Amino acid sequence: MPVSVKNSEVLFAALKSAGITLLSALPETWLVHVMQMAESDPDITLIRLNKEEEGVGISAGAHLAGRKSAMLMQNHGLLTSVNGIVSVAQLYRIPLLMVISYRGEMGERDPWQTEGGRITEPLLQSLGIIYRKLSDPATVAYEVRQAQTLAESSLRPVALLLTRDLMWEE
């Protein structure tokens, strides 16, 4: 199963349309095309991370500098970022758009991804983070805009979960 280039293009265009000019990411299979597009786009700064939690600080700095940013990560990266999300983004009211590949849900073929998938939504709920699951490319631009608007108006983290139906071509 290859990652959908077409839907990656839809997602990248939606991020740009929402005014995102800075992306932070660790290499991630489902987001590889989005990262490649960011690297080749002169209007976007892509910062490669050593661990996902660093992206919280980068997004905080971007916000303080007047730039809109988003973190690209897998849901296991969300798990490792909880301390930064709570201690920086929530405590200091930083608008944080998290674009998360949602591994471990229905149809997952990799057993090592299933536990992270099982706890992703309950974790977001326990942190009070509003999220949406994206599966239809026709709604991606709308959902990205809505999520960015909410992050900015609430000064809180917001998450978009990218499903297998959106990111993979069967």
Ranges and model annotations:
Residues 1-170:
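Thiamine diphosphate
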